[in-house]
From Swiss-Prot:
Residues 231-283, 845-885, 927-949, 1419-1444 are annotated as: Disordered. Residues 258-272 have a biased composition (Low complexity). This is Adhesin P1. Residues 851-860, 868-878 have a biased composition (Polar residues). The gene is mgpA. It comes from Mycoplasma genitalium (strain ATCC 33530 / DSM 19775 / NCTC 10195 / G37) (Mycoplasmoides genitalium). InterPro entries: Adhesin_P1 (IPR022400), Adhesin_P1_C (IPR004940), P1_N (IPR022116). It is found in: Cell membrane. Residues 240-257, 933-946 have a biased composition (Basic and acidic residues). The chain crosses the membrane at residues 1353-1373. Keywords: Cell membrane, Cytadherence, Membrane, Signal, Transmembrane, Transmembrane helix. It is a single-pass type I membrane protein.
């Protein structure tokens, strides 16, 4: 506690310091003892001194704890409404000496033992608390569970209601909450307030190891991620190995027959369909087996041996990825899971904190409600289990299997082998015994996926929901955990009992497909009755927008791509059903052939185009020949596979069938707000990363009323044996009363895609920067690591960069728009090489020079200045005069890349994914060496390797993002050779090569969602990668349509980092109502490079771009983007690989980013902190700032106070600004520091008006106490009745009494004593603000509070009257009270009796001193000048109290 000045009674500090740390007193308050019996005029000393609190806080406020947020959720602080308004915020200690590696893991220890040891170590190293603030932003006290001496649960009455007295506080049982020892060391990451009681709160706790996941021992986490420094033969990107199968012509067991048009349903249009193959599956005499022509017989040989299948974790693959803990371990070990604790808090009471219930978020509660199909072995994605050929496509349980999505399986990849396939193994005939009821590897919720799901807690009614996090808590390179569902804790009406349940999104938001009714019952996710799709989300947040509850984020739906449960003759009858996505995708149309299972090469794509009966944008199926697809050659896409054999430990791309012949399914994007669900036919498999925007209004009443247990029927289960399962029919007319129908109204409105028209997307709608030219490094096909060879340096295809050089040929085409943001000048680059305007101008070409309206000399791609020619080589064209007219054989794709059709949903999807960097694309070249990509005629689509064809294969490669591919195929490590494809460049290993791997340059994953920002009552938005996405008028849409705007900043900087998401610090609403985002590159982490001790080969990968505000509107030659990656000499071939690596070393990158060295970081030279606002820095006196003599911008202040988004608005409280986030970020003050009266400073009124408590000798006790003391105030509101207020307070003439009130804090009927608190009304919000006071020596000092407060809570006095100045610095808690709107209240001075002090300089100086101490603002003023010349030499301010 603090040591007060001597003339203050020590006890009078007891409550004061417990209640205040940072804030300003805006008036005076008094606590008086009135004793009717003694009839004397003096008043006893009465400072509010709570007794020894039963719930004891070690320190009222621990000044070493600073604000922070968890990177997995949307929470920064909670605004509290109700009886004692204010807020809760998260605070933590900053320990730079944390060394988790000091906790050793013995080889005999399991993960749980190790995690417990880490947790114990962290207990002594870190402190976490929630901090209670009052309505002025003053910190009252910290609730630190770990330091509570005797925590107690609340006493309850007969009906279970908590016992509470406004003065004494909560009744306490003396008993600690349930499992206190397990939960007291956990970290609070979110707090919500109950809508039922202003004093009831819920805190979400997670173990410390979840926060430190990325820092755990690499034997635990890194090993799980298969990043090993020692074993060079191990390749983390490969996970478990597969062999390429080859055709087995000896197998002819399939019964194949042609179907003719006459066998098709007469009601179906046949003009667009070719003949399909009929496949029958016959059951043997035994119902659980198939006939001897069993499809499961091995139809494919393997390269190594005919029977061996290498799928187990053996031989050189010694490690399979495993989650940190299994579902059972989390459920059993309560200290290792998340917990929600209810607690009661009333800050102005004696016992002000008491605990309620403790609920552990048991992952099994979610798993129990998984659909039965998630627990049963599914067919492999060719439709049938096949033990011997299972490694063909690494299938185990459908597409959502442990090999592709190990985060959701308890054994990770360890079960992704042939040990427990669910049927007998070892039978030579491989007969099936039928399927086990439960798979050995059901979908579960182990550590990584579980903590991805913990976040965004909301209290609705008598329930608390955890809607899911954004996945960053446990996100690493080889894992992409996402939220899979919603947890709910349901309480009884008096919150005395509770129950936990969980629902997967698949059921909560899923509607059954019914082709007869256009199927989707207005729900976001279309599914089938087996719930074979596993939707997952990166949740941005769940917030109240206006009066609606909105969930927003990004979503992947995914599918299992299993064959339909129809015989093929039925399939033929129901082609429309097939096309509508009844469990069908590209792979579903694979026919059983002697070649194995594959799409028939002789079925034209047109066979699957739909007629008018189908969906407008149905799926289209491309040629898919297994001989090409799975037995690729080195000079085609085999380069993509073979390159995984290198040992670069950070190559974290998991290869999966990179095929030049892959079809690419798209979401049906729409700007409609209703009935445009994500149905299976638009989903690209169960991709890793989210690939659609998603926002929905939820029905909170239905959510609170749903049952704990979901009951599935027999219809939701697969048939019990394989033959029956293969022929299991779909329900074409599902019963409307199916057991999940009750969920149909959970979502009231949703959107799954943007209206891109007239958005900022239009600035590059027409040309995506993803067409690379022929070579990996400019025109050189052979990058080399030898110092003697020379290789030109690469450029990056990027947004506003990589625009086609021959752009003028396209700009005037019909329907093509090129809309730039104002004053925007992109550089004209291509992926082919560094673009120079001339030999002397090496900084790119301004857009103005290539616009069609410009008469200047057009850019000449044939000029030698615009080529990068290897020494001794011949120059080749590096730009493309025209994009291909067609990129696919289907009509819907014709404009998909040239983007002249604005309403093309595929185009929209392509565009978003290209912005997010999630589209690696293989494009096969066509033509000979003279016109490889220049063909402007229709390319043939049935050729794969020859010059006369160009069949682009659009393969989204399972949602992998370009950062991974850039790293894997980029310029890193020792295996840089001619066979490594380079992202965005031609993978040209030989003249016969025909594949180019192309990708966009904005390298974000769509998992990189920021926190949800409420912009107004109908709009909201969040940061997605480098873009801020605004959902405009979502709550009250205009004519049923939604406007989604994507806005970025104009200046770009490439950041090279392993974990780019660590740099994003959050978005908030600026004072002018504009959403802004905050970045801190100093928070970027890189994985250690253990293979080298020096910084030659950087360990950082180009993972994302950081946008910074462009403060110069004109085109700038010093563009930071150019400078960061600009080659040393762009026109010379002299620089080689070494130069590039040198250029990209961590040290150089840091220098480019302005991060500097450790010494310069201290004074924040550059600091590496980038904001989207100009920070208000205080380099001088406050009043100077208002005169614009310093960097405080008066206009900003004016805008703030004039705007409707004032600092008391609903949106601002702590949800926005991030101050000293992790100890490295400099203080960001987003609210103005001061506001003097009308911006002018002091008034010069000579008459002193006073508002003060009357001294005892002026109080009419005879009038006051003719009645019992309880008659003086309203027992319900505890406010002194209006008629008695003037008897206690001196009010100036003409003063509006309605602007103050007296709140009763304590009273005694026995002694006839009364304690009151004076509260002022904030004229802007009309809320009353309590003003605390520390009176110590009677009425004479009650009115001289200024020398009794700690220095840093002094108000400013400018002569007389007093002007109250509000300083707001903590947590962005928007503390300001612009009382100047109420002139009379402000001009009412305080009676200083016999003291006149000039406290202006003292107040300002000491306040700023304290702010500096508390927030670490390094550029705070060195000296504060006086605002008025009345006292040239200020008195030395008393020293603030020091800790004992």
């Amino acid at each position: 506690m603090h040591q007060p000045k001597k003339r203050l009674a020590k006890k009078s500090w007891a409550f004061l310091t417990a209640a205040l740390t940072l804030g300003v007193i805006t008036g005076v308050g008094g606590y008086f003892l009135f004793n009717q019996n003694k009839q004397r005029s003096s008043v006893s000393n009465f400072a509010y001194q709570p007794k020894q609190l039963s719930v004891k806080h070690q320190q009222a406020v621990d000044e070493t704890l600073t604000p922070w947020t968890w990177n997995n959720n949307n929470f920064s602080s909670l605004k509290i409404t109700g009886e004692n308004p204010g807020s809760f915020g998260l605070v933590r200690s900053q320990n730079d000496n944390l060394n988790i590696s000091s906790v050793t893991k013995n080889s005999s220890d399991d993960n749980l033992k190790y995690l417990n040891a880490v947790e114990k170590y962290l207990d002594g190293q870190q402190n976490f608390a929630i901090r209670r603030y009052d309505n002025n932003g003053r910190a009252l006290y910290d609730i630190n569970l770990a330091k509570m001496e005797n925590p107690s649960t609340v006493q309850r009455g007969l009906n279970g209601e908590p016992i509470f007295d406004p003065f004494k506080g909560f009744g306490l049982t003396g008993n600690a909450p349930t499992d206190w020892n397990e939960i007291k060391g956990k970290v609070p990451v979110e707090v919500v307030q109950s809508p039922h009681s202003p004093n009831l709160y819920f805190v979400l706790l997670v173990p410390k190891v979840a926060l430190e996941y990325h820092n755990l021992n690499n034997q635990v986490v890194k090993e799980s991620l298969e990043v090993k420094a020692t074993q060079s033969s191990f390749n983390p990107t490969q996970r478990l190995q597969k062999d390429s199968p080859v055709k087995d012509s000896s197998k002819q067991g399939e019964k194949l027959s042609e179907t003719t048009a006459s066998s098709m349903s007469s009601g179906m249009a046949t003009s667009t369909r070719a003949k399909a193959l009929k496949v029958e599956v016959e059951r043997g005499s035994q119902s659980d087996s198939l006939l001897k022509n069993d499809f499961a017989k091995k139809p494919l040989k393997h390269k190594n041996s005919s029977g061996e299948v290498k799928l187990e974790a053996e031989k050189e693959f010694t490690e399979a990825w495993k989650p940190l803990l299994t579902t059972d371990q989390i459920a059993r070990e309560k200290g290792m899971g998340a917990t929600v604790v209810s607690f009661y808090d009333a800050p102005y009471s004696e016992n002000h904190t008491a605990f309620g219930l403790v609920d552990h978020i048991d992952p099994k509660k979610m798993v129990e409600n998984y659909p039965p199909s998630w627990k049963t072995p599914k067919w492999n994605h060719h439709g049938i289990w096949d033990y011997n050929a299972r490694n063909l496509l690494l299938q185990t349980t459908g597409f959502f299997n442990p090999r592709r999505h190990p985060e959701w399986f308890d054994e990770g990849q360890a079960k992704a082998d042939n040990t427990s396939p669910g049927f007998k193994v070892g039978d030579t005939d491989h007969k099936k015994d039928g399927f086990k009821k439960n798979s050995s590897s059901p979908i579960a919720l182990p550590f990584e996926a579980y903590f991805a799901n913990i976040g965004n807690m909301v209290a609705i009614g008598n329930s608390v929901f955890i809607f899911g996090g954004n996945g960053h808590a446990t996100k690493m390179f080889t894992t992409n955990p996402l939220s899979i569902g919603v947890f709910r804790i349901k309480y009884t009406d008096n919150f005395s009992k509770s129950s936990v349940t969980g629902w997967p999104y698949a059921v909560l938001f899923g509607g059954l497909i019914n082709p007869q009714t256009n199927g989707l019952k207005d729900l976001p996710l279309g599914t089938n009755r087996w719930f074979e799709y596993v939707p997952r989300m990166a949740v941005s947040g769940v917030k109240w927008v206006g009066n609606q509850l909105v969930l927003a984020g990004t979503l992947t739906m995914g599918d299992t791509a299993t064959v339909p449960r129809l015989k093929y003759d039925q399939l033929e009858k129901h082609l429309n059903l097939v096309a509508q996505g009844q469990g069908l995708l590209r792979e579903d149309l694979q026919i059983f052939t002697p070649y194995g299972w594959a799409n028939r090469p002789d079925i034209p794509v047109g066979a699957w185009l739909q007629d008018e009966m189908g969906s407008k944008f149905g799926p289209h199926y491309f040629l898919n020949n297994p001989d090409i697809q799975d037995n690729v050659n080195n000079d085609t896409v085999e380069a993509l596979i073979s390159s995984y054999k290198n040992t670069d430990k950070l190559k974290h791309v998991y290869p999966y069938r990179y095929s030049g012949l892959y079809a690419w399914q798209l979401f049906n994007w729409s700007n409609k707000l209703t009935n445009t669900p994500l149905s299976a036919n638009f989903v690209n498999e169960n991709s890793y990363a989210p690939n659609s925007l998603f926002a929905a209004i939820l029905n909170e009443d239905l959510l609170t009323g749903l049952s704990d247990k979901i009951f599935y029927g027999k219809e939701n289960e697969f048939a019990e044996n394989e033959a029956d399962r293969f022929n299991q029919l779909l329900s074409l007319n599902p019963n409307p009363n199916t057991n999940w129908a009750r969920y149909l109204n959970v979502v009231q409105r949703f959107t799954t895609g943007p209206n891109l028209d007239s958005s900022t997307f239009d600035q590059f709608l027409d040309f995506l920067p993803w067409i690379g030219n022929g070579k990996p490094f400019s025109n050189s096909p052979s990058p080399s690591t030898s110092a003697s060879s020379s290789t030109p340096l690469p450029t990056f295809s990027n947004i506003n960069v990589g625009v086609k050089s021959m752009i003028t040929q396209h700009l005037n085409k019909e329907n093509t728009r090129w809309v730039f943001i104002p004053n925007f000048s992109p550089d004209i680059w291509t992926g082919a090489g560094y673009r120079v305007q001339s030999a002397n101008q090496k900084n790119g070409i301004p857009f103005e020079q290539v616009k069609p309206s410009n008469n200047s000399t057009p850019f000449d791609p044939n000029s030698d200045d615009n080529k990068v020619t290897p020494s001794g080589g011949s120059s080749k064209p590096t730009t493309y005069p025209a994009l291909p007219n067609s990129i696919s054989p289907t009509s819907d794709w014709i404009n998909a890349l040239t983007f002249t059709n604005k309403n093309n949903p595929q185009r929209n999807q392509l565009l978003l994914r290209s912005l997010l960097g999630t589209i690696p694309v293989l494009i096969n070249k066509s033509g000979d060496s003279n016109d490889q990509f220049n063909k402007d005629s229709e390319q043939k689509w049935d050729k794969t390797e020859t010059n006369e064809g160009n069949l682009p294969g659009f393969g989204e490669v399972n949602g992998l993002y370009n950062a991974a591919l850039l790293h894997t195929y980029g310029f890193f490590g020792t295996n840089t050779n001619s066979t490594d494809p380079k992202i965005g460049f031609k993978a040209d290993s030989s003249s016969s090569s025909s594949s180019t791997l192309v990708g966009s340059g904005l390298n974000w994953t769509s998992q990189d969602v920021g926190n949800l920002v409420v912009i107004n009552d109908t709009s909201f938005g969040f940061q997605l990668g480098g873009w801020f996405i605004t959902f405009t008028d979502f709550i009250r849409p205009r004519t049923g349509y939604l406007g989604i705007t994507l806005s970025s900043l104009q200046d770009q900087t490439i950041i090279w980092a392993d974990q780019p998401w660590t740099s994003f610090k959050g978005s908030y609403l600026d004072s002018d109502g504009t959403p802004k985002s905050l970045w801190d590159p100093t928070a970027l982490k890189s994985l250690p490079n253990s293979s080298t001790t020096y910084d030659t080969n950087p360990t950082l990968s180009p993972s994302f771009q950081l946008y910074q505000p462009n403060k110069v509107k004109a085109y700038q030659t010093t563009n930071t983007y150019n400078k960061l990656i600009e080659p040393v000499d762009a026109t010379s071939a002299a620089t080689n690989m070494t130069s590039l690596l040198k250029l990209l070393t961590t040290k150089n990158i840091k220098a480019k980013l302005g991060k500097g060295t450790a010494s310069s970081q201290g004074n924040n030279n550059g600091g590496g902190v980038s904001q989207t606002i100009n920070t208000i820095t205080t380099t001088g006196n406050i009043s100077e700032g208002l005169k614009e003599e310093t960097s405080i911008q008066a206009e900003t202040l004016k805008k703030f106070f004039d705007s409707k988004q004032n600092n008391k608005s609903e949106i601002g409280i702590g949800d926005s600004t991030f101050t000293k986030m992790d100890g490295k970020l400099t203080g960001v003050v987003s609210t103005p520091l001061v506001n003097l009266i009308n911006g002018q400073g002091a008034t010069s009124d000579s008459d002193t008006e006073k508002i003060s408590f009357k001294p005892g000798n002026q109080i009419d006790f005879n009038r006051l106490f003719t009645l019992p003391v309880t008659e003086l105030f309203d027992p319900n509101t505890m406010f002194v009745y209006d008629q008695y207020v003037p008897l206690l307070v001196n009010l100036p003439s003409g003063f509006d009494q309605a602007s103050i009130r007296l709140k009763v804090i304590s009273y005694s009927v026995e002694n006839q004593t009364l304690g009151v608190r004076l509260e002022f009304k904030d004229p802007q919000t009309q809320q009353f603000i309590p003003v605390l006071n520390a009176s110590s020596t009677g009425p004479q000092t009650v009115f001289q509070p200024f020398n009794q407060w700690a220095d840093y809570v002094l108000p400013l006095i400018v002569t007389v009257p007093i002007v109250v100045i509000i300083l707001s610095v903590t947590l962005g808690l928007t503390i300001g009270i612009p009382m100047h709107r109420n002139k009379k209240a402000l001009q009412a001075g305080f009676d200083l009796s016999n003291k006149k002090v000039d406290v202006l300089t003292k107040a300002v100086g000491s306040v700023f001193k304290e702010i500096i101490n508390r927030t670490g603002i390094s550029n705070a003023p060195k000296k504060l000048k006086q605002a008025t010349p009345t006292k040239p030499t200020p008195k030395t301010p008393p020293k603030p109290p020091v800790k004992q």
